[in-house]
């Protein structure tokens, strides 16, 4: 199951667990990984040529 837009917190994980168990239907569950996008603090834009 892939879910985007949730904050990285225990509460978010606990919200996903019931959905994961329902989809598993008795099969084993593997937690593959976690991808986190961190906002850039000092995002610099490309300078104008003119």
UniProtKB/Swiss-Prot annotation:
Q: Which GO terms describe its molecular function?
A: damaged DNA binding
* A GO biological process held by the record: DNA repair
InterPro entries membership: DNA_pol_Y-fam_lit_finger_sf
Listed SUPFAM superfamilies: Lesion bypass DNA polymerase (Y-family), little finger domain
Q: Which domain of life is it from?
A: Bacteria
**Name assigned to this protein:** Uncharacterized protein HI_1564
> Which species is the source of this protein?
Haemophilus influenzae (strain ATCC 51907 / DSM 11121 / KW20 / Rd)
């Amino acid at each position: 199951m892939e879910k985007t837009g949730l904050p990285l917190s225990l509460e978010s994980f606990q919200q996903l667990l019931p959905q994961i168990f329902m989809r598993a239907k008795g099969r084993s569950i593997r937690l593959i990984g976690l991808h986190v996008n961190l906002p850039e603090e000092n995002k610099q834009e490309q300078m104008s040529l003119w």
